[in-house]
Amino acid sequence: MTCGACAKFHRDILPKIKEKYVDSGQLRLEFRDFPLDIWALRAAAMARGAPAKRYAALLEVLYRQQTRWTSADDILAALKQIGRLAGLSPAYVQACLKNGELLDGIANSRLQGNREFGIASTPSFLIGDRKIDGYLPWPEFDALLADAVG
């Protein structure tokens, strides 16, 4: 959630993937959290703790407002403000940020990604059995996906 390249992917590449491959039923997307710092962990907890119908919209706001909230003097207050924009009360956001089971699950997801797939940085992608590290421009990403769907 604090990775600039992840925000760029989410903003510039993900909508194209959804339109061309996911909406047509050719591919399925699965997001796994891989927080690299405490604020990424907390932002992921807020998103994962939100009602399922708000998850995608909350991710959208977190990535679009990333520079603003990650550079805020009070990052926790900035996260709560984003939560409010997504319809979550400050108390609800606070509960997500203190939910040990949720935080542990996200941290374990990161460890699993590292252990099972060798993921050590963000963004990283698994396309079939191929691991891609780092941001790729749309033409390169599109070529990989086109090859994967045959």
Residue map of PLM features:
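C-terminal cap of thioredoxin/glutaredoxin-like
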Residues: 14, 81-150
